A protein has these predicted regions:
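Local cysteine-cluster metal-coordination motifs and their immediate loop/turn environment
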Residues: 65-75
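Single conserved hydrophobic/aromatic residue that forms the stacking wall/gate
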Residues: 171-173
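Flexible, acidic/Gly-rich N-terminal and inter-domain linker regions that tether
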Residues: 1-65
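Core AdoMet radical
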Residues: 76-91, 98-124, 130-168
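Generic serine detector
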Residues: 11, 22-23, 38-40, 49-50, ...
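A common structural microfeature
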Residues: 52-55, 67, 106, 140
Length: 173
């Protein structure tokens, strides 16, 4: 499966997470026209920063594959839906390429549970580590903690979700 197929599946699956504020309404997007965009293109959504700015995020799942069968969840294991999983490297590269092109200012990341909560969180941590360390990404990251993950891994995930600018500002205090 190519990266575009994965992006299509995993951004569509992420739309069920009600944490971003885009209405999903069409905003004049017309195929082939320059300058017209849609809030639903390529998994982009909008949210507001603490200072009131509207921020565009890449909203995706690491994976929509899940070992659980929660009846309320579209990604439950018995649901007949196309499945996809990014590697940490694919997710980091996709995010940084969207960022470099000014499509997004940050990442909203969640996931189905692959094997176990800890295993899934370790993959998320790897993706965020690549973004922060290798690509020096200083944008906004919202990473959803997977229920049942060990506290140590949740702490690592949270640390990587805080921007380095924010950390540096508090180091001088």
């Amino acid at each position: 499966m190519n990266l575009l197929d994965k992006l299509t599946i995993l951004s569509d699956a992420a739309k069920y997470d009600a944490a971003c504020t885009s209405s999903g309404a069409k905003r004049g997007y017309q195929e082939g026209k320059i300058g017209c965009t849609s809030t639903s293109v390529a998994g982009c959504c909008h949210t507001f920063s603490s200072d009131g700015r509207c921020v565009t995020l890449l909203k995706v799942l690491l994976s929509n594959d899940c070992c659980y069968n929660c009846k309320y969840c579209v990604n439950r294991c018995t649901n007949d839906t196309p499945r996809a999983t990014f590697t940490p490297e694919e997710l980091a590269e996709l995010t940084i390429e969207f960022y470099r092109r000014n499509y997004i200012e940050g990442l909203f990341l969640s996931s189905g549970v692959l094997r176990s909560p800890d295993y899934t969180t370790e993959l998320m941590i790897r993706a965020l580590s690549i973004l922060r360390s290798e690509y020096r990404f200083n944008g906004y990251i919202h990473a959803k903690a997977i229920p049942g993950t060990s506290p140590e891994l949740v702490e690592q995930l949270g640390f990587l979700s805080v921007s380095y600018t924010h950390l540096r500002a508090h180091e001088t205090v």
